[in-house]
């Protein structure tokens, strides 16, 4: 069993924010795989596709760890069964990167997960939302909606990200990393 957590902020106000690309990913994955309807729990919303649970925390981004530890306990999975999908301002828009483990890179949602589950040993799929213009505060940038051009890139990246997770689940992490870590979407 695998749990794929897409990070974002709950509510329609944030739906197309750069910070919500993790939510966009699980929505796309659900659509492609024809998963069950969303079910609501105390700290998260989930959908099931066979032995895969798609999860959206109902907490705000910086408290994502609360939702992840709750779903980890509810679904009886280890941290190695968790894949976290989130935005990365240090990665250009149009790129994705898979990592087996690592630090938070300053991402507060990811840091919250590390703090709550007590380890950084879980797979993560980073989706690029950068570069951030120098004259904009980071918090303001990630909470802005994607531009039309960025949305066209993100639309294609999300398809590739679904493919990447499919390869990861069926052919292994190493194969997915070798195929998709150098991939770049161009318009």
UniProtKB/Swiss-Prot annotation:
Cellular component per GO, a single term: cytoplasm
Active site: 19 (proton acceptor)
Binding site for tRNA: 14, 60, 62
GO biological process, one term: protein quality control for misfolded or incompletely synthesized proteins
Claim: S-adenosyl-L-methionine is one of the keywords in the record: no
Cellular compartments annotated: Cytoplasm
UniProt GO molecular function: peptidyl-tRNA hydrolase activity; tRNA binding
Site (Discriminates between blocked and unblocked aminoacyl-tRNA): 9
EC number assigned by the record: 3.1.1.29
Cystine residue pairs: none
Task of the protein: Hydrolyzes ribosome-free peptidyl-tRNAs (with 1 or more amino acids incorporated), which drop off the ribosome during protein synthesis, or as a result of ribosome stalling.
Protein name: Peptidyl-tRNA hydrolase
Organism: Pseudothermotoga lettingae (strain ATCC BAA-301 / DSM 14385 / NBRC 107922 / TMO)
Gene name of the encoded protein: pth
